[in-house]
Amino acid sequence: MKAEKLAAIIDSDFYTGVPDSQLKALCNYLMGTYGIDPKHHIIAANEGNCVALAAGYHLATGKIPVVYMQNSGEGNIINPVASLLNDKVYGIPMVFII
């Protein structure tokens, strides 16, 4: 699937992530479309920061954000996912591309 089609299906206007060679097509699409505009695309230092940024975006806008990462970054999202996204805490919806 092409990155443009994936983005159209997801229909989000906020992406944050840690670039990865396996996600090169998506990263290139996001850079070409949004660049590093903090209203739409933020490249973060680690995956846990991405989840926190996306959670803040949702709390501020009510919209569903997207987090992209390589599979080795899953361990870095455990704490923010368990605390911020849990339905008994804030119940924040989020799309993950791994």
Regions found by a protein language model. Give the residues of each.
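Thiamine diphosphate
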Residues: 1-98
